[in-house]
Amino acid sequence: MLRKISLLLLPVFVAINLVHSSPEIMKNLSNNFGKAMDQCKDELSLPDSVVADLYNFWKDDYVMTDRLAGCAINCLATKLDVVDPDGNLHHGNAKDFAMKHGADETMAQQLVDIIHGCEKSAPPNDDKCMKTIDVAMCFKKEIHKLNWVPNMDLVIGEVLAEV
């Protein structure tokens, strides 16, 4: 279940395509991002509270605070090779991943730039998981400003269809 809910988080590390509907691309990217979630859930012994955090992430007024949710995002990003060993976005790999899953070059770069800006604006934190929470919340805010939030009904529908 956690793997399925994590599908909602791909946009934290990938981009959008102008040719297609941005929410549709976000949905596609989310579906691909979560493929490593079962491994991360097992490796980190993630509780159900993390599932709730990931499920609620895109709600406009929801604030994710559970450190383990940040750890889950880090695990996924590491498995997909979109972050460097320090936990920072690997610009080239993240852009390539986004383009592989439907984003055009311009939008992939735009999202990489947003994430990079969020990394720079997040307060210093030696805890990688909490730093990821700060970056993710900043990113979510920017995605809401652009009206690129994926349609949750469509995401959940596709997740359930895969079960």
From Swiss-Prot:
InterPro entries named in the record: Odorant/phero-bd_Lep, PBP/GOBP, PBP_GOBP_sf
GO molecular function, one term: pheromone binding
Tissue: Antenna.
UniProt name for this protein: Pheromone-binding protein
Keywords for this protein: Disulfide bond, Pheromone response, Pheromone-binding, Signal, Transport
UniProt similarity note: Belongs to the PBP/GOBP family.
Subunit structure: Homodimer.
A Pfam family this chain is assigned to: PBP_GOBP
GO biological process, one term: response to pheromone
Its job: This major soluble protein in olfactory sensilla of male moths might serve to solubilize the extremely hydrophobic pheromone molecules and to transport pheromone through the aqueous lymph to receptors located on olfactory cilia.
Disulfide partners: C40-C75, C71-C129, C118-C138
Species the sequence originates in: Antheraea polyphemus
Signal peptide region: 1-21
Top-level taxon of the source organism: Eukaryota
